[in-house]
Regions:
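Short, glycine/proline-biased beta-turn/loop segments that scaffold the active-site neighborhood
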Residues: 105-129
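Mid-domain, small-residue-enriched loop/turn segments at the edges of structured enzyme/sensor domains
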Residues: 153-212
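Bacterial N-terminal signal peptides that target proteins for export
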Residues: 4-17
Length: 310
């Protein structure tokens, strides 16, 4: 019996040894994890921002969608970041990004001819050059810096239409953004319609891919960012919510239901850039949009990220 007991204990110990070691490893892992992470700053920032965004929605009687990424710290601020909104003219940056991906810089000197019949509802630049046409580079400038709708339509046609633009987005991993129509129809999005919509997170991720990633050459990225930095339509939106000395590259958009959007890259002094997307709309189809809503939301985001001039 004594021998039997010893055999049992030894045998049992051998069988249990791997389990004990695994349990110890697990406990050690759990212990380290608990030591290393008090509630992540990211979560705390999101919760703080969320309360403020709710108050902002009430103040403006609007709906907000926000995604911000500090590329230096990997911290985010999100609010309705996976909900769909009409993207309106913000998509023009992504379309130019897709154009750059598919063409050399030299190919952008190709001149595109068009007629007065191609002009749509907003053509501050293209209407001046019906007789001569414009190069792809000039169309990109008109589309991003002046939000010229005809310029954007001509770029979309160069890509092969909305369906081919969508394929380009899928190739960079954007499975959410849903191009379906040309300007100006794409700005009319009824509640529940997914055409020409995206989410704040998807737009931010695609913007980051084109403007800050390595999918484009440095020369192409610089060209895209330069157009956004010299944008003429965004002074009262994200730009109005950051300190004056910070650099901002952005693209705005507006549409039915008071849609007002801005997608941007922000460079605080001596820090890595912040990617910020703010989308908004209202309940009534004929509602007016609010530029100040976007500026106020920007201030909340930067406060939540604890980004300063220092």
């Amino acid at each position: 019996m004594i021998v039997s007991k010893k055999f049992f204990h030894i045998s049992h110990y051998k069988k249990m040894l791997p389990v004990v070691l695994l349990s110890c490893a697990t406990l050690i892992g759990c212990s380290n994890s608990n030591i290393q992470s008090e509630p992540p700053k990211q979560t705390k920032q999101e919760n703080t921002g969320n309360h403020s965004f709710v108050q902002l929605e009430k103040e403006y009687d609007a709906k907000l969608g926000i995604y911000a990424l500090d590329t230096g710290t990997s911290q985010t601020v999100t609010y309705r970041s996976d909900e769909r909104f009409a993207y309106a003219s913000t998509h023009k940056v992504l379309a130019v990004g897709a154009l750059l991906q598919k063409n050399s810089i030299e190919a952008l000197d190709q001149r595109i001819k068009y007629t007065s019949e191609d002009l749509v509802n907003y053509n501050p630049i293209t209407e001046k050059y019906v007789d001569t046409g414009m190069t792809l580079k000039e169309l990109a400038d008109a589309s991003i810096r002046y939000s010229d709708n005809t310029a954007q339509n001509l770029i979309l046609k160069q890509l092969g239409g909305p369906s081919e633009f969508k394929k380009s987005l899928r190739e960079i991993g954007d499975t959410v953004t849903n191009p379906e129509r040309f300007e100006p129809e794409l700005n009319e999005v009824q509640p529940g319609d997914t055409r020409d919509t995206s989410t704040p997170k998807a737009l931010a991720t695609s913007l980051q891919t084109y403007a800050l990633g390595d999918i484009l050459s440095t020369e192409k990225r610089n060209f895209l960012i330069d157009l956004m930095k010299r944008n003429t339509t965004g002074d009262n939106l994200i730009r109005a919510g950051v300190p004056r000395e910070w650099e901002v590259a952005d693209k705005t958009g507006s549409g039915s239901y008071g849609t007002r959007n801005d997608i941007a890259i922000i460079w605080p002094p001596n820090k890595k850039p912040i990617v910020l997307v703010i989308l908004s709309n209202h309940a009534k189809e004929d509602a007016k949009h609010d530029d100040k809503l976007i500026a106020d939301a920007t201030k909340i985001v930067l406060d939540a990220l604890k980004v300063t001039n220092k």
